[in-house]
Amino acid sequence: MAETTKIFESHLVKQALKDSVLKLYPVYMIKNPIMFVVEVGMLLALGLTIYPDLFHQESVSRLYVFSIFIILLLTLVFANFSEALAEGRGKAQANALRQTQTEMKARRIKQDGSYEMIDASDLKKGHIVRVATGEQIPNDGKVIKGLATVDESAITGESAPVIKESGGDFDNVIGGTSVASDWLEVEITSEPGHSFLDKMIGLVEGATRKKTPNEIALFTLLMTLTIIFLVVILTMYPLAKFLNFNLSIAMLIALAVCLIPTTIGGLLSAIGIAGMDRVTQFNILAKSGRSVETCGDVNVLILDKTGTITYGNRMADAFIPVKSSSFERLVKAAYESSIADDTPEGRSIVKLAYKQHIDLPQEVGEYIPFTAETRMSGVKFTTREVYKGAPNSMVKRVKEAGGHIPVDLDALVKGVSKKGGTPLVVLEDNEILGVIYLKDVIKDGLVERFRELREMGIETVMCTGDNELTAATIAKEAGVDRFVAECKPEDKINVIREEQAKGHIVAMTGDGTNDAPALAEANVGLAMNSGTMSAKEAANLIDLDSNPTKLMEVVLIGKQLLMTRGSLTTFSIANDIAKYFAILPAMFMAAMPAMNHLNIMHLHSPESAVLSALIFNALIIVLLIPIAMKGVKFKGASTQTILMKNMLVYGLGGMIVPFIGIKLIDLIIQLFV
């Protein structure tokens, strides 16, 4: 999954060429009415080639009509090729995933505790299996016993094994992954054919892909333009009769194909599929094309501080006692409150305490773990208790117990916060001893990324459980626009609703069960693959690498998808207008000499003018395939700036390029006439 696929790999091109011919079947082509019009024109040209008197008025040579047939055929093949190539890349990724679904046996645990070996395909929801070192997990499940490291690289591309154990947020395992060490007992949670891997394959292959609202709106516009141009073409026949100008049916067919928006009509499906593919190349699964497209409309990002903006492993940097306590007493209490704390922060406090060369206590007590509600952790001994935690929570505890708050505590807490650190207050028996300074490190490159997002009109909001000062310092250092301090997971849904009430499109990341409501509420929810099943079901995007920073990448991909579609649509419509004014003067100058003044290109003849435009129309589809597949490149700028730039490049370019291309092709045709 993590490996990217080159656009024009030989095996993909060969398969795409075969598929592009198979897609000529009319039942398939009618799904794209614009290209179906081209196919009808191609069949009429073929009929006129075989039976020149089909309409009792054909005035051009059979070779000329056959040339039109061949060019129209190539136009259809090129349009189908772009779609087939985009689909082929998805199928290649799906085949890579399918390789992990090799036939395997499963060790099912029967009710009497004995084992039986059965085919993994025979496993049902609720069955319990035992998986040991080196064995593959046969299907999606939930760990009910044991602790093991699991290698998920076959699914996620991430080489580092992850720890799975019963209980908590990390007890879900994916079928197709393998146990790297120890053993697990797993309760199967999905029926055969409905596993996470099966869903991934379906998503990657695009089997469930439907047109997005923007695609439907654009398609409606293109169909309207097609009908308008067809009506214009139909009126030309009686007009030519009135002017005593013999306008052949073959030329009318060619002119119709030149003027309707075949360029974007042939590339529209490929653009959407390629957009999904670019997301997949980042190891992100999109549940629908709509979710990727919505990313392009996002203007507010809700970001967690820990793990997204900072590296997440805050390290103890200093012990700062209050005036009424001593340094040694603070170190001992901090050590005792952290000795059983297995978090990175807890381990760093113990490590820093050892460096102080103080005789540390060895008394054993009952560990009180940190919770989102209490926001503190510590140890209860027989005659006393020590805690460390968020300043507000600790002060509240002391006040409720009738204790004394040191006068210099507030200054110490603010001092740590102003440095961008996180202060933890330490107390013993409701007596505050001092502050632990936890250092937070901003991830590299985020300042520039946030600046780029700001220039594009995207606002970043940092949500953190830290106090106001710490949050403000980190927000300023990272360059986020706003922050929400002392924010609990359940508070995020309120932040999202507030932004949506302002008319904003909101995106957020999450991995826990408590994030699921907010992920479902957000317009774009990116769940971590390492997270809970409820979070992954609530989100519309899943990051297989479990890297929350990727939310920013997905938003940029979504914007690129919309820009690519808009840019190529602008280019296509500008092309049609340019071809209209390039061809018509050359066609009618014999019947209407005044039209010769408009024939600024001085094309050789009406026949060569139409043929040149038709060839250009086919070639431009091929030339635009790389842009449709890779997307339009852009740098951070406001929407208005990007729009003006694209109008200049693709609008003006779309007007100029046809004049140049058609003239060059006309000159080449003259060499063979």
Swiss-Prot record:
A GO CC annotation given for this chain: plasma membrane
EC numbers, comma separated: 7.2.2.6
Record-annotated membrane-spanning stretches: 34-54, 65-85, 216-236, 253-273, 581-601, 609-629, 649-669
Catalytic activity, reaction form: K(+)(out) + ATP + H2O = K(+)(in) + ADP + phosphate + H(+)
Annotated membrane topology: Multi-pass membrane protein
Active site per database record: D304 (4-aspartylphosphate intermediate)
Keyword Membrane: yes
Domain of life: Bacteria
Any GO molecular function: magnesium ion binding
Residues annotated as binding Mg(2+): D511, D515
Cell location: Cell membrane; Membrane raft
InterPro entries: ATPase_P-typ_cyto_dom_N (IPR023299), ATPase_P-typ_P_site (IPR018303), ATPase_P-typ_TM_dom_sf (IPR023298), ATPase_P-typ_transduc_dom_A_sf (IPR008250), HAD-like_sf (IPR036412), HAD_sf (IPR023214), P-type_ATPase_bsu_IA (IPR006391), P_typ_ATPase (IPR001757)
SUPFAM superfamilies in the cross-refs: Calcium ATPase, transduction domain A, Calcium ATPase, transmembrane domain M, HAD-like
Keywords: ATP-binding, Cell membrane, Ion transport, Magnesium, Membrane, Metal-binding, Nucleotide-binding, Phosphoprotein, Potassium, Potassium transport, Translocase, Transmembrane, Transmembrane helix, Transport
Family matches, as Pfam families: E1-E2_ATPase (PF00122), Hydrolase (PF00702)
Residues where ATP binds: D341, E345, F370, T371, A372, E373, T374, R375, M376, S377, K388
Main location: membrane
PROSITE patterns listed in its UniProt record: ATPASE_E1_E2
Assigned protein family: Belongs to the cation transport ATPase (P-type) (TC 3.A.3) family. Type IA subfamily.
Stated role: Part of the high-affinity ATP-driven potassium transport (or Kdp) system, which catalyzes the hydrolysis of ATP coupled with the electrogenic transport of potassium into the cytoplasm. This subunit is responsible for energy coupling to the transport system and for the release of the potassium ions to the cytoplasm.
Subunit annotation: The system is composed of three essential subunits: KdpA, KdpB and KdpC.
Protein name: Potassium-transporting ATPase ATP-binding subunit 1
Organism: Staphylococcus aureus (strain N315)
The gene coding this protein: kdpB1
